């Protein structure tokens, strides 16, 4: 018989840098999860992504045990990295903060493919291009 699920917690934590401080500690403490156990397991799994924001979905069970699923870093992180920017435009649609090439958008799409709601690479590239546009970053051919 499957374990009974108590709830889910969605967080975005820097890879390899989970610690009991907010937002991790309070979110897990409310559900009665062993915070240090989660932090050690998360940091071990995300050593390769050090310094990148990692979305994680934690499944909490009734017996206070947990599982977690790591997703790939957000598309906005990859887009800013490719455009060599710290942030997007203050006025997307009016001012352009930077640009990325279509090839860079394809590379980002291949990295994000498993987390995107797309069936092929062409659709995934359109999603990434839309994200870039909403950040005020132009996609050039």
Curated annotation (Swiss-Prot):
<dbReference type="InterPro" id="IPR006519">
    <property type="entry name" value="Ribosomal_uL11_bac-typ"/>
</dbReference>
<dbReference type="GO" id="GO:0070180">
    <property type="term" value="F:large ribosomal subunit rRNA binding"/>
</dbReference>
<dbReference type="Pfam" id="PF00298">
    <property type="entry name" value="Ribosomal_L11"/>
</dbReference>
<keyword id="KW-0687">Ribonucleoprotein</keyword>
<dbReference type="GO" id="GO:0006412">
    <property type="term" value="P:translation"/>
</dbReference>
<dbReference type="GO" id="GO:0022625">
    <property type="term" value="C:cytosolic large ribosomal subunit"/>
</dbReference>
<protein>
    <recommendedName>
        <fullName>Large ribosomal subunit protein uL11</fullName>
    </recommendedName>
</protein>
<keyword id="KW-0488">Methylation</keyword>
<dbReference type="GO" id="GO:0003735">
    <property type="term" value="F:structural constituent of ribosome"/>
</dbReference>
<comment type="function">
    <text>Forms part of the ribosomal stalk which helps the ribosome interact with GTP-bound translation factors.</text>
</comment>
<keyword id="KW-0699">rRNA-binding</keyword>
<dbReference type="InterPro" id="IPR020785">
    <property type="entry name" value="Ribosomal_uL11_CS"/>
</dbReference>
<comment type="similarity">
    <text>Belongs to the universal ribosomal protein uL11 family.</text>
</comment>
<dbReference type="InterPro" id="IPR000911">
    <property type="entry name" value="Ribosomal_uL11"/>
</dbReference>
<dbReference type="InterPro" id="IPR020784">
    <property type="entry name" value="Ribosomal_uL11_N"/>
</dbReference>
<keyword id="KW-0694">RNA-binding</keyword>
<dbReference type="InterPro" id="IPR036769">
    <property type="entry name" value="Ribosomal_uL11_C_sf"/>
</dbReference>
<dbReference type="InterPro" id="IPR036796">
    <property type="entry name" value="Ribosomal_uL11_N_sf"/>
</dbReference>
<keyword id="KW-0689">Ribosomal protein</keyword>
<dbReference type="Pfam" id="PF03946">
    <property type="entry name" value="Ribosomal_L11_N"/>
</dbReference>
<comment type="subunit">
    <text>Part of the ribosomal stalk of the 50S ribosomal subunit. Interacts with L10 and the large rRNA to form the base of the stalk. L10 forms an elongated spine to which L12 dimers bind in a sequential fashion forming a multimeric L10(L12)X complex.</text>
</comment>
<dbReference type="InterPro" id="IPR020783">
    <property type="entry name" value="Ribosomal_uL11_C"/>
</dbReference>
